[in-house]
Amino acid sequence: MVSTSSFQTTKSEEIFAAAQKLMPGGVSSPVRAFKSVGGQPIVFDRVKGAYIWDVDGNQYIDYVGTWGPAICGHAHPDVIAALHEALEKGTSFGAPSVQENILAEMVIEAVPSIEMVRFVNSGTEACMSVLRLMRAFTGREKIIKFEGCYHGHADMFLVKAGSGVATLGLPDSPGVPKATTSFTLTAPYNDLEAVKALFAENPDDIAGVILEPVVGNSGFVLPDAGFLEGLRELTKEYGALLMFDEVMTGFRLAYGGAQEKFGVTPDLTTLGKVIGGGLPVGAYGGRQDIMEMVAPSGPMYQAGTLSGNPLAMTAGIKTLELLQKPGTYDYLNDITQKLADGLLKLAQDAGHAVCGGHIGAMFGLFLTAGPVHNYEDAKKSDLVKFGRFHRAMLERGVYLAPSQFEAGFTSLAHTQADIDRTLAMAKEVFSHL
């Protein structure tokens, strides 16, 4: 592991300097630029299990997990072997494959709301498509989303969004027409009364409600008791649809996702990350009567050249097979609870104002006394202190998300020893932060 005395990132700095001349900000996604934590971003070279190595040879315990997909650990040998076999048959068919059928059946069996599923190439694409479907099915144009919830970078979702938008402090994005966002109504997360008011003002205009059932893109925020159930009742009352964006929570909180964990079944669900086993993927699914509106069965058009490609399907199949093993989610919950509780106690013992928690294999720590129920609460965090915390942990061989407004992830590859070492490093950092 890295020690602070030997920590150096000369090669990362050289590569990133070159990248800035080639790509906007030197990255392919904004949060990777370390803007909210300061310092130079790390350029990585390889991954294995719970670990990630940079181009300078530094090794880290990884709690980013390629932003969620690596729930079985990086480069799991079973996934790699399955991909090698699939590669021999070709990288893409642009036509139906048996792998699509197998993964579709696994998803339908696992996720309570999904009776039919369509594969796409990213979570953004899944959310774009499902919004069009919600409007097509209901004949209505408006949607309700929640402040700080991120559903990809499509125009209609860049209204009080989370993730990179929150990280960079942008209220929205230039280039998004006001006419587009006028159909997007927003409410604070966990505020059922605000949602009731929006429905009362627009009783016949709202196609549906879209949300992260557990927020991971403005930090880690759990739903208050009764919030998800209240949304389910309201959408039924007004003839609107309820959509869970489970791109992050799907197969991570439980095999059936957040909807299994909380016992609330939406009409539609988006997935991504885990179901591709580390390869680009997305999916949307739900009730059969709604999904049959999707072309070619119905009139709502959506298509994709690489959708359902055999490599992503193969990696997804093998990943879900690994997750089906007995004890998987008990182990994930146990190590994540140990980590989250440990970080919270260490910070509090050192006199820092913090709050946080975990659910399944997902966790978060806010540098504010809290509690955090929504995006406005999350924004009270001490971002300067978080930047120092992130850098100090990085120098000690622990890679956390480079933003206060992103959740953390554990995997089956993380050991008790990894958690113990992480907490030992955190104790050292909190004592001097």
Curated annotation (Swiss-Prot):
Cofactor(s) listed in the protein's UniProt record: pyridoxal 5'-phosphate
Pfam family, one: Aminotran_3
Gene Ontology biological process terms, A to Z: chlorophyll biosynthetic process; protoporphyrinogen IX biosynthetic process
Transmembrane portions of the chain: none
Xref: CDD domains: OAT_like
UniProt subcellular location: Cytoplasm
PROSITE patterns in UniProt: AA_TRANSFER_CLASS_3
GO molecular function, one term: transaminase activity
InterPro entries: 4pyrrol_synth_GluAld_NH2Trfase (IPR004639), Aminotrans_3 (IPR005814), Aminotrans_3_PPA_site (IPR049704), PyrdxlP-dep_Trfase (IPR015424), PyrdxlP-dep_Trfase_major (IPR015421), PyrdxlP-dep_Trfase_small (IPR015422)
Keywords: Chlorophyll biosynthesis, Cytoplasm, Isomerase, Porphyrin biosynthesis, Pyridoxal phosphate
One annotated Gene Ontology cellular component of this protein: cytoplasm
Signal peptide: none
Pathway assigned in UniProt: Porphyrin-containing compound metabolism; protoporphyrin-IX biosynthesis; 5-aminolevulinate from L-glutamyl-tRNA(Glu): step 2/2; Porphyrin-containing compound metabolism; chlorophyll biosynthesis
Catalytic activity: (S)-4-amino-5-oxopentanoate = 5-aminolevulinate
EC identifiers of the protein: 5.4.3.8
Gene3D superfamilies: Aspartate Aminotransferase, domain 1 (3.90.1150.10), Type I PLP-dependent aspartate aminotransferase-like (Major domain) (3.40.640.10)
Top-level division of the source organism's lineage: Bacteria
Keyword hit for Cytoplasm: yes
Residues with the N6-(pyridoxal phosphate)lysine modification: K273
Stated family: Belongs to the class-III pyridoxal-phosphate-dependent aminotransferase family. HemL subfamily.
Matches recorded under PANTHER family: GLUTAMATE-1-SEMIALDEHYDE 2,1-AMINOMUTASE, GLUTAMATE-1-SEMIALDEHYDE 2,1-AMINOMUTASE 1, CHLOROPLASTIC-RELATED
The protein's assembly and partners: Homodimer.
Protein name: Glutamate-1-semialdehyde 2,1-aminomutase
Gene this chain is encoded by: hemL
